[in-house]
């Protein structure tokens, strides 16, 4: 697999992570280096590990995984996005915004944004190509674009406030819907 192909796949896979990071950056105030590291590291790590997992499992479970992966991603993204929209409408004095770079929220977002990378790993296995270089590049690109998305999201959050939090939640829901439609109606 040539470098241009690997880079193209990496950027395409990182787009969901970038969009989620944009939404996360809009709701975290102030964003610290810890936030950037946690989300960038975990999104990059999951994006790198999923193709390896797909490659290792190969064709043995492809039918089972492909039947449910889109539902898992849809459910996770709609849950987190819905919670963001709900929190945007809560009273400010009662509100302690949840940090999407911590705990189960971070894990759910990491899994949801990297499920497509698992399918790429299955494809790489079918090609008989080593997964190690593509997985490394996929992880690095996802990590860098996640940090860039958070920084851009912070600027939007400072300027537009709650509207960006609502939009961010809706974007997560729409990404989930897009994944679901791509794997069901548009197949």
Swiss-Prot record:
Listed under GO cellular component are:
plasma membrane
Task: Provide the alphabetized UniProt keywords.
Answer: Cell inner membrane, Cell membrane, Ion transport, Manganese, Membrane, Transmembrane, Transmembrane helix, Transport
Q: Which residues cross the membrane?
A: 3-23, 39-59, 65-85, 103-123, 124-144, 166-186
Major place of residence: membrane
Topology relative to the lipid bilayer, per the entry, is: Multi-pass membrane protein
Molecular function terms from GO: manganese ion transmembrane transporter activity
| Compartment(s) of residence | Cell inner membrane
Q: Which domain of life is it from?
A: Bacteria
Matching InterPro entries, A to Z? Mntp/YtaF (IPR003810), Put_MntP (IPR022929)
Give the residue range of the signal peptide.
Answer: none
Q: What does this protein do?
A: Probably functions as a manganese efflux pump.
Protein family membership = Belongs to the MntP (TC 9.B.29) family.
Q: What is this protein called?
A: Putative manganese efflux pump MntP
Q: What is the lineage of its organism?
A: Bacteria, Pseudomonadati, Thermodesulfobacteriota, Desulfuromonadia, Geobacterales
Give the gene symbol: mntP
